[in-house]
Structures are given as C-alpha cells and as structure tokens.
Amino acid sequence: VDLATGVITTVAGDGTAAYSGDQVSAVQASLAGPSGVALGGDGVVYVADTFNSRIRSVDPATGQIATVAGDGGTYRYQGPAEPSSPSLSRPAGIAVGSDGNVYMTDSDSHLIRVWNGRSKTISRLSGTGVAQFGGDGGDALAGSLSYPFGVAVDASGTVYVADTFNHRIRVLTATA
C-alpha cells in the first residue's frame, strides 16, 4: 500500500497457487501460499513462497522474480552429519539482516536457516530437526525448536525466533 495515496498494488503473484518458474515478471509468476515478506536494504523484496518450499526475490529494477533458496523439494533434516541441503520444508518467516543475509524459518524441519547473499549458500543457524523444546543458554545448533513460524533480526545481528509450537520467543546471540 502506498501510504501517500492509499493505493494497493500487486508486487508478486498472479493469483494461482502453483510454481511457474523464475526470471519472469513477478506479477505474472505463480506463488503458493506466500506467508512471509521482507525488504532488503537494496530494495529487493524477499518472499517466503511457503507451499513451493522456496524463498523468492523480486528485483526492484526489473520486476523479475527469482528463487534464492529452496529447490521445491521437501527437506527433512536428519542430523549434524548430514550434508547441507538446498531444500526447505514450508518456509514461513523471513527477515533480512543489515549484512544482506536472509534468515528464514524452515518450519517443518524445525530449523532456522540463513542464506548468505555473498556466497549464495544456505546453512543451519539453529535447531536440531526434532520438534521439541531444549537448549536454552547453549549452542543454537543444539537448541530444539518446534515449528518456528516467525523470525526477525536486529541491526546488531541478534536473531529473534517465534518458536510457535513451544509457545515461546527465542533469541539467538553470538554468546548463546
């Protein structure tokens, strides 16, 4: 919504619940249950395309949509020995840090993951992949989450997580 005029317009999605590919006009692209949106410092709009298991970006200069994380496959984290996977399982919450990294909830895998904008890689930031509560005061990678649906990051890089099914807001800091 343009606050000056009160006009609402569509930035992404054609109203069809599907996946229609990348490098097309964002308003002609299909999304399936978008549930999170965040704005990068460079004006890029990031969308949690939840039921397509992807994080998408809309370029402000071209209006084109692209996938930045997720490949449409269903991801189920199996443990720390497992190689990193580009797949996501129902990403919902999304936030962009001042460093340009995109933080996301990998909700059905019970993880918080981060996409590094420079290296174009995705890694696990928190969660064990098991829906339970645990790990307060310890290593974030050993801390358990249960269906996290929201994430935010402040200017100092502290990450806040809506640990939805544990009915808690969790904080990930450099010392915890």
Predicted regions and their residues:
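Blade-level signature of beta-propeller repeat domains, shared across WD40, Kelch, NHL, RCC1
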Residues: 149-175
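Short loop/turn segments immediately following the C-termini of beta-strands
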Residues: 3, 50-51, 107, 117, ...
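Conserved beta-propeller blade signature
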Residues: 44-47, 101-103, 158-161
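A short loop-to-beta-strand structural motif that recurs across blades of beta-propeller domains
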Residues: 7, 53-57, 64, 110-114, ...
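Residue-level detector of Asp-centered blade-edge/turn motifs that repeat once per structural unit
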Residues: 39-42, 96-99, 153-156
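Glycine-centered low-complexity coil/loop motifs and glycine-rich tracts
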Residues: 18, 48, 105, 131-132, ...
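Gly/Pro-rich loop segments of beta-rich domains
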Residues: 5-33, 62-92, 119-149, 175-176
